[in-house]
Amino acid sequence: RTILQRITLIAAQNQEDGERFLSLGLKRNQLAVTGSLKFDISVTPELAAKAIALRSQWASRRQVWIATSTHEGEETLLLEAHKELLKNHPTLLLILVPRHPERFPVACELTRKAGLTFTQRSTGEVPSSGTQVVIGDTMGELMLLYGIADLAFVGGSLVERGGHNPLEAAAHAIPVLMGPHTINFKDICAKLAQDDGLITVTDTASLVKEISTLLTDEDYRLYYGRHAVEVLHQNQGALQRLLHLLEPYLPVRGH
């Protein structure tokens, strides 16, 4: 409470967080709910052009799904799902992107053990028509790789890691799937799910079922992709609201 008495303003990302500060003794006139800065992302024309070019190189006549920010215990489930999906979608390509660099070689080994053919993004090798998996073992390319995919699974959510950011996938207007463990992005996932911008899966079987439907039903796929990006757009503006709140505290700029 002593610390809160010395604070002039708190900008909370949602009402729930704001209420927590009020319960600690913050005065209501010192609280502003700005929304989450994570919504303030977009796909630039340059990025979109790069993604289109890479898609034409990698999979001009193939469907592609991406699984990102995966953790120990998830890659095995995702590779099992991919093997199952290949039975009805034999040309399907999976881009598998582990969360941490130390899991890049592990993902390669798990893919090899699963009996799937793969390439590594870091080598620059272009996937052939027989390549079933691309291991996304580079840094800083996630937004580009999302741009290649028809749908995305965001990891840390089938295992109890709290989930990772679904908005980077949503920005590309593609369907977003996550497991049940999304506490790290509780508010964002709730907003997406409420407006049909997020599909929740619980295991390999439900993942296969949902992805199969998305791959075979274009209207269903476009519906979820459109709703995901609409939720993103509807919740943008946090950065501008924050800058507006900070303006009175910043020094006046000279002419």
Indicate where each model-derived feature is located:
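Nucleotide-activated sugar donor-binding and catalytic core shared by glycosyltransferases
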Residues: R1-H255
